[in-house]
């Protein structure tokens, strides 16, 4: 049963890794929407106190968005490829334009969840109403022929998000809530429009600057997906067999289940890869060509003998497009 569950999780992992990034971004957005709804129901409680409302409302919108953004940056493999590139090669082979595009890719993917959080927060309007209710101009409020009483206006307005305040001012409370929710939702829709325009322009710029045809770009994407899946699967088997060999040398035997016995028999491991080889296949990769032939990854480049003491130096390759 445990093996079946593990196999199902492995299948789901490979399934999502093999799909287009837009599907993944959509799932991230849906998860963020659910989290925001849960937060609004369970954790959001406006203090309804002057000065505190503003800090609490902005914190409720900004801090979760910042946390989601940092998590997105941390979970993006390109982030650590860029770190490795700076550590091992000082990014000497990356020109300004590809580096900018790569950073844009990292930040763009990391921004999906925080932008979704901010948009949903603004469309709901609760945090915005909480933050700005005390700053509404009392002289602009009217309920019939009556104006808002100027005495203690800030304290009264700060209590409106909680439905509190003098009973004779309930009409003003509804007007304040309606006005601030209008502003909040307006900003939310504007944010959606700005993000949509930026995504459209980024896609256009990417395809306009790409020297590759659509079919070759699709092939390159398929190659990267397949290489990553095969590499991860092979690395798991290699590490398991190597661990079994080392345990056998220490104890004189190793307790293996049937699947592990088949792996050890079918895939004998004699040694490990030296650190320079790992460094050679790790880091930022740009589409490059060598003598007119494409090199689709650092592993592909290493396999062709074009790194380290290989037959061709890095500078004969042409950096064309970021991944």
Swiss-Prot record:
Keywords assigned by UniProt, alphabetized: Cell membrane, Disulfide bond, Ion channel, Ion transport, Membrane, Transmembrane, Transmembrane helix, Transport
Reaction equations catalysed: ATP(in) = ATP(out)
Protein name: Calcium homeostasis modulator protein 2
InterPro entries per record: CALHM
Molecular functions per Gene Ontology: monoatomic cation channel activity
Segments for region (Central pore): 14-39
Membrane among keywords: yes
Entry GO terms, CC: plasma membrane
Topology in membrane: Multi-pass membrane protein
Annotated localization: Cell membrane
Pfam families cross-referenced by the UniProt entry: Ca_hom_mod
Site (Not N-glycosylated): 168
Primary localization: membrane
Cytoplasmic side of membrane: 1-21, 77-101, 207-323
Transmembrane segments: 22-43, 53-76, 102-132, 180-206
Region (Intersubunit interaction): 214-251
Residue numbers on the Extracellular membrane side: 44-52, 133-179
Record carries keyword Disulfide bond: yes
Subunit details: Homo-undecamer. Two undecameric hemichannels can assemble in a head-to-head manner to form a gap junction.
Function: Pore-forming subunit of Ca(2+) homeostasis modulator channels. Mediates ATP release from astrocytes and ATP-induced Ca(2+) influx in microglia thus regulating neuronal ATP and Ca(2+) homeostasis, synaptic transmission and neuroinflammatory response. May form intercellular gap junctions. The gating mechanism remains unknown.
């Amino acid at each position: 049963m445990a093996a079946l569950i593990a196999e199902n999780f492995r299948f789901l992992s490979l399934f999502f890794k093999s799909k287009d990034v837009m599907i993944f971004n959509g799932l991230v957005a849906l998860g963020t929407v659910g989290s925001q709804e849960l937060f609004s129901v369970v954790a959001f409680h406006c203090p309804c106190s002057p000065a505190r409302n503003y800090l609490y409302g902005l914190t409720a919108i900004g801090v979760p968005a910042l946390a989601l953004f940092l998590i997105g940056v941390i979970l993006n493999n390109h982030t650590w490829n860029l770190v490795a590139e700076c550590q091992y090669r000082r990014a000497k082979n990356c020109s300004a334009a590809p580096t900018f595009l790569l950073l844009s890719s990292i930040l763009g993917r990391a921004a999906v969840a925080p932008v979704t959080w901010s948009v949903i927060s603004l469309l709901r309007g609760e945090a915005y109403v909480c933050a700005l209710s005390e700053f509404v101009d009392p002289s602009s409020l009217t309920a019939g022929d009556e104006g808002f009483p100027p005495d203690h206006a800030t304290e009264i307005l700060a209590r409106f998000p909680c439905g509190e305040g003098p009973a004779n001012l309930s009409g003003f409370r509804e007007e304040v809530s309606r006005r601030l929710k209008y502003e909040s939702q307006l900003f939310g829709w504007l944010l959606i429009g700005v993000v949509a325009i930026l995504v459209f322009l980024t896609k256009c710029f990417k395809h306009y600057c790409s020297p590759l045809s659509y079919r070759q770009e699709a092939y390159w994407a398929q190659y990267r997906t397949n290489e990553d899946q095969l590499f991860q699967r092979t690395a798991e088997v290699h590490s398991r067999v190597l661990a079994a060999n080392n345990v056998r040398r220490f104890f004189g035997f190793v307790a293996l289940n049937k699947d592990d016995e088949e792996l050890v028999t079918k895939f004998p491991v004699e040694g490990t890869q030296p650190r320079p080889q790992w460094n050679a296949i790790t880091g930022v990769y740009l589409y490059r060509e060598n003598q007119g032939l494409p090199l689709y990854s650092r592993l592909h480049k290493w396999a062709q003998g074009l790194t380290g003491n290989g037959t061709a130096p890095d500078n004969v390759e042409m950096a064309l497009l970021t991944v």
